[in-house]
Each structure stands twice: as C-alpha cells, then as structure tokens.
Amino acid sequence: MDSYIAITLFGCFFVLVFIGVPISFSIGIATVASMLLMFPWDIAAITVSQRLANGLDNFALLAIPFFIFAGTLMNSGGIAIRLINLAQVMVGRVPGSLGHVNVLANMMFGSISGSAVAAAAAVGGTLNPIQTKQGYDPAFSTAVNVSSCITGLLIPPSNVLIVFSLTAGGVSVASLFMAGYLPGILMGLAVMIVCGIIAKRRGYPLSERATFAQACKAFLDALPSLLLVFIVMGGILGGIFTATEASAIAVVYTFILSVLVYREVKWRHLPKLILESVVTTSIVLLLSGFSVGMSWAMTNADIPYMISDALMGISDNPLIILLLINIVLLIVGIFMDMTPAVLIFTPIFLPIAQELGMDPVHFGIMMVANLCIGLLTPPVGSALFVGCSISGVKIQHLIKPLLPFYAALLVALMMITYIPQISLFIPQLLGLM
C-alpha cells in the first residue's frame, strides 16, 4: 500500500509540474490524491487543511516577508552601483578585473538582498555594457555574472536557509547563517579562479588603479549598505534579537538607507515595492504550507524510510550515499526552484544524512549549495534566464562558456560535502554548536 501512495504522490506531482501547473498547487493536489488512498474524502480534506494551517502557524516564518521586503528595497535603492564601485577598488588590478568585480559585487549584493536573480539583474545590468566596451566576450561576461550571482545565497542573511531551518524542525538559524560564510566564499573563489585563468589567456585588460581618495570614497559610499550584515548578524550572535526580529530591523534600516539617505526610492514607489514583496511572500508561504502537508503524507506512508532503504541497498559507504544524494539534488535543481526543492526533499534526505552521522547544519549548507547550481541550469534556471535577458546573449550560446564554471562549482560542492569543517568551523568557533 505504501508503494502505491508513493507512486501516486510523486507521479501526480511530476505530471502536474510537467503540464505547467504552478508548483504550490501541484504539491497540494498530489498531497490530496495520496491522502485519498489513506483516508476517506472528508478526513483527507480536513487533514490537508489542518496541515496547511499548521505549516503557516510559525512565528519564525515572519522573517521571510521582512527579508523579502528588505531585499526589494535594496534592489531599487542604488546599492548595487556602490557595491560595484567598492569591488572595482578591491580587485581592479587583477587580470580580467571586471569579471572579478562582477563576482565580488554579486557576492556582496546577493548576500544583502538574498536574491540571486536580483543580483544577476542589478550587477549584470551595470557591468555587462562596460565589459563589452572593453573587449570582453558578451557570452563570457554573462557566464561570469550568472555563475557568481548564486554565491550570495549562502552568505547571510538568507531566506533559503530560514526555509531549511523550519523544514528541518528548527535547526538553529544563527548556526546556519554562520555556517554559510565559508562555503559561499569558496564558491565565489571557484568562479574567480576560472574567470582569472580565462581572462589571462584572452588578454582582457586591467582596470585603472584607483587613487587613495577614490578608494576611500568607494568604501564610505558602500559602508552603510555593508553595515546591514553586521547589524543583523551582530544582533543575532550577541543575543540582542532573534533572526525574526532581525528581519524587521533589516527592513527599517534598509528603508532609512534607500528612502532617506540614498534617496533612490521615492515615497510614491513604496506601494509598488510593497505589492511586489506581498506577491513573492504569498508564493513562498503557500509553498511552505502545502509542503508541510506533503511531508506529513510522506512520513505517514514511510516514504523517507523506503528511500533510505533503497539508498542503503546500493551501498553502506557514507561517501557513496552522499554522492548519490548530491546527484539526485542536482537533477532536482534542473527542474525545480530552490524553495520547493528544500521544502520537499529535506524531510526525505535529512534523516538519511543524520543516520550517516552528518550534522543537520552541514547537510543544510550542502543542500543549498547544491540547489544553487540548479539556478544556472535550463529549463528552470531563473538566474540563467535573467542573465541572458540582461545581456542579450542566447541561452544556447552560453552553455559552452558556462561549462568551466559548472566544473569549478561542482568541485566546490564536493569540498563542502566531504570537508565538514568548511561549514562547521565558524559556528563551532563561536560556540553555536
């Protein structure tokens, strides 16, 4: 019976996604279909409704709309150009300097805004025309932009890590945030190494050396934006406020910065920005609610144990099992966005990882790093589509230039997977674990 429930649940879900039904409704319909095999219609309907309500009845979920609104304000607040100017001062004399500026700016902007798509649009939209004027191949510039925009998703504050924390049963958000720093930087360095090698071979120019006055101005212009990370993380680590309270403080700080200090966001723009944030939040919360129901159905049908037994039947070597999990997640990332993938597959793979002795924080970072790569991969790679639309490069012309960056990111993923201290060193150093 359990096998029929599993086939119904996943079969219905993937068929609905394939024919274009929104993922949140695909999850909900598949959950109802599987529960009808377990309960009568009236009990199944009540159970789904209860699980949907329970999935949203969590105070920590308030962090998501606040961080989303903060990110929306940042996207329109003139922060990207200030971070780009700072990055140019920092790496302007490295071969292929504008490529490295792109990577560094994406890391900073992505971590502050929490959105790879926003980072790709803001940074790529500013730098791609400049790179083209200086002789950079547009496909190469786009490949650098697309592959680096994902690195900021691991560097806190990160909405995806909050979603993982809630799905994993309350794994410490502070531990996840601090664990994301080194893996995020590692993925950024991997992209920069490939960028530097290709740029040196092609003879791409260096930027002009910044004077001390220019460097000071760039730093001071970007400092208010960078302070947001220190305020949020310092407050969480210092026990001054929780991650949820930090998200509200991030909104207040970003509002002051964008509206009153930089004055890039006008009062008349606020209703539109609020509406954008509400729409995005609605999508995430609906996914979260339905995914709780799906997770309950999977657990009730012993699906995680069935998958665990299947994996353990292939090999009892933890290294092989983790490799298989990574392969499955890479395939999932090709067809599914990060948030639904985290919501659906965390309840399946986290128990297996814990059975192997893997820390939940380490697993969360590995999972998010893995799914980040899916943002670069068609047919659902949102960062890929945005990067191409910004630069005007066709996707088919971008696949070959992206391959070296894919390889570098996969090497970084394997290091994150098999070297736990890359993720756990900072949380352990700070006494969070």
Task: Outline where the language-model segments fall.
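Alpha-helical transmembrane segments of multi-pass membrane transport proteins
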Residues: M1-M433
